[in-house]
From Swiss-Prot:
PANTHER family with a match to the protein in the record: ACETYL-COENZYME A SYNTHETASE, ACETYL-COENZYME A SYNTHETASE 1
Binding site for ATP: 387-389, 411-416, 500, 515, 526
Swiss-Prot/TrEMBL keywords: Acetylation, ATP-binding, Ligase, Magnesium, Metal-binding, Nucleotide-binding
Source species of the chain: Bartonella quintana (strain Toulouse) (Rochalimaea quintana)
Protein name per the record: Acetyl-coenzyme A synthetase
Signal peptide: none
Length: 652
């Protein structure tokens, strides 16, 4: 762990919304009297009917989480309408296309009109409050319009990352019984064309075989590429919008009405539908956006995340727009047309805050400094990281090379389930350590707990838990409250178990050490090992599969697969490549296998349980620390696995 302290820059401290003294005062208030603290900060959004109840939460028994439960509001109203009187002509959204020559700026007035038209299209097609709408779109302005249109009329959106396959889409459609889909003909991502409508057509067929029938598909024209068309089911957005009205009243939404479902990987292989509701989520993401990014009116803020992930929901769309900010949406990738794209965008749009993933930082760091040095980046004030812990080397490169030693780095730890930032520096309050997420946000009570359930004090390492609720917390797993309780509240009774390991140093700084369950964090995206194993075993040549993570210089964690073959099948380069393509087809390109090791047997206990601990060590090339292997049914299997390992680089 890095012990060098990076002080708060004087110019940041001078103008910051929160200094160290205010942080300490507010944090104490938020812990000592959360009811009063969140009653005050709940006023940051506008209410149609004010709340009288603030916090009604329990982590025990049936687990119930309610915030501002008798208040009535609307998320889209707060993100658009309330800004129109004073800021209607301010830029709400800057869109930077995949092509460097394509961009557009949308004011709050224009955003209002786009969202109302979109909402009226949904209503014209019978979509109503409580209906689930699947959104499978590239990073185009219509993706933001679609989300906000759902929020405006009270429909529950389920956004699916545009890299997911037909099978993964179908899983999500079936789970939430969505019958209305919004997609595009195709998507552009770097030099690749993504056949979105084609994927949706296949997903609809799969869902139908599983008993869920999609009735309507709204298609946005992005490339004008050739697509299949089902008359009576498929509708063109550009045709529908031409006769849609430009005004649509915001639905009266109870504070605890669902806002969206976002699916995240589960250790059983079945994706979990994380449910976020209306008011508490919006209070929390707008507050964290304002204070974590020290947002001042007029600044240009850029979160590089895709809308298919929680970062895109909370810190590209809802948090910034609720605060009346200018938020930048980028369709492309950081390395297209070359590795200077991020820095060109920063200069072109005079970006003040850049919030991106360690994966992107490592990839750009690997390209050398020349691309960075050819840009000015003088507009940058703050840098942020999200999605996974950032290693100190990448942190320092980001700080020194990109930020010219003057931009604080906001290393934020949080989850799809938490809704917003949980452990994070505040620019004007927090001295930094490279690789540490530093301190908890207001209202966040952390505990580090050992394997026996003992709470560890002072300098310690163990499992990270949160002992009380916060407004942005997920409320349940969609249609599976039992799994919600089992997943998050059964390991340590009365506490939210994050599934992450954590260290606290002697200065009280927190360091996230990574997942301690069977979830991989690949390029900041969570993938269940069970889901990948299921995909592998569905291949006719595969008898058994076990998947583990290993340190990857770019992606954080790589995907290492151990596979045993069916009788009569022999390993080959062709099969190796076929397995990679098969998993991509089953799950999506995000699940790109990095290493495949063919093995006659997997290490199993006498009861038949695969010893993943051993596989992890071998994948990490750390086989000197295998521990006790005497419980294996056939200990000699380990020697073969070590001899044929695919990763021969020692762990850091």
């Amino acid at each position: 762990m890095s012990e060098k302290i990076y002080p708060v820059p004087t110019d940041i401290k001078k103008n910051a919304l929160i200094n160290e003294e205010t942080y300490q005062k507010w944090y104490r208030e938020s812990i000592n009297d959360p009811e009063a603290f969140w009653a005050k900060h709940g006023q940051r959004i506008e209410w149609f009917k004010p709340y009288t109840k603030v916090k009604n939460t329990s982590f025990n028994g049936d687990v119930s989480i309610q915030w501002y439960e008798d208040g009535i509001t609307n998320v889209a109203y707060n993100c658009i309408d309330r800004h129109l009187k004073n800021s209607g002509n301010h830029i709400a959204l800057i869109w930077e296309g995949n092509n460097p020559y394509h961009d557009k700026k949308i004011t709050y007035n224009e955003l209002y009109e786009h969202v109302c038209r979109f909402a009226n299209i949904l209503k014209n097609h019978g979509v109503k409050k409580g209906d689930r709408v699947t959104i499978y779109l590239p990073m185009i302005p219509e993706a933001a319009y679609a989300m906000l249109a759902c929020a405006r009329i009270g429909a529950i959106h389920s956004v699916i990352f545009a890299g997911f396959s037909s099978e993964a889409i179908a899983d999500r459609i079936v789970d939430c019984k969505s019958t209305f889909i919004i997609t595009a003909d195709q998507g552009l991502r770097g030099g690749k064309l993504i056949k979105l409508k084609n994927n949706i057509d296949h997903a609809i067929d799969i869902a139908a075989r599983r008993g869920v029938h999609v009735n309507q598909v709204l298609v946005i024209r992005r490339t004008s590429g050739t697509i299949d068309w089902v008359k009576g089911r498929d509708f063109w957005y550009h045709e529908e919008i031409s006769h849609a009205k430009t005004d649509c009243p915001a639905e009266m939404m109870n504070a605890e009405d669902p806002l969206f479902i976002l699916y995240t990987s589960g250790s059983t292989g079945k994706p979990k539908g994380v449910l976020h509701t209306t008011a508490g989520y919006l209070v929390y993401v707008s507050m964290t956006h304002q204070y974590v990014f020290d947002y001042h009116p007029g600044e240009i803020y850029w979160c590089t995340a895709d809308i298919g992930w929680i970062s895109g929901h909370s810190y590209l769309i809802y948090g910034p727009l609720c605060n009346g900010a200018t938020t930048l949406m980028f369709e492309g990738i950081p390395t297209f047309p070359d590795q200077g794209r991020f820095w060109e965008i920063v200069d072109k749009h005079k970006v003040n805050t850049l919030y991106t993933a360690p994966t992107a930082i490592r990839a750009l760091m690997g390209a050398g400094n020349s691309f960075v040095e050819h840009s000015k980046r003088t507009s940058l004030r703050l840098l942020g990281t999200v999605g996974e812990p950032i290693n100190p080397e990448a942190w320092k490169w980001f700080y020194h090379t990109v930020g010219d030693n003057r931009c604080p780095i906001l290393d934020t730890w949080w989850q799809t389930e938490t809704g917003g930032h949980m452990i994070t520096p505040l620019p004007g309050a927090t001295q930094l350590k490279a690789g540490s997420a530093t301190h908890p946000f207001f209202g966040v009570q952390l505990q580090i707990i050992d394997g026996e359930g003992n709470v560890l004090e002072g300098e310690a390492e163990g499992n990270l838990c949160i002992i009380d609720s916060w407004p942005g917390q997920m409320r349940t797993l969609y249609n599976d409250h039992e799994r919600f309780i089992e997943t998050y509240f059964s390991t340590y009774k009365g506490k939210y178990f994050t599934g992450d390991g954590c260290k606290r140093d002697n200065d009280g700084y927190y360091w996230i050490t990574g997942r301690i369950d069977d979830i991989l964090n690949v390029s900041g995206h969570r993938l269940g090992t069970a889901e990948i194993e299921s995909a592998l075993v569905s291949h006719p040549a595969i008898s058994e599969a076990a998947v583990v993570g290993y340190p990857h210089p770019i992606k954080g964690q790589g995907i290492y697969s151990f596979v045993t073959l069916m009788e009569g099948i022999t390993p080959s380069e062709e099969l190796y490549k076929d397995l990679i393509q098969h998993v991509k087809k089953e799950i999506g390109s995000i699940a790109l296998l990095d290493k495949i090791q063919f093995t006659p047997q997997l290490p199993k206990t006498r009861s038949g349980k695969i010893m993943r601990r051993i596989l992890r060590k071998i994948a990490e090339n750390d086989f000197d620390n295998l521990g006790d292997i005497s419980t294996l049914a056939e200990p000699q299997v380990v020697d073969d696995l070590i001899a044929n390992r695919q990763n021969t680089e020692a762990t850091a």
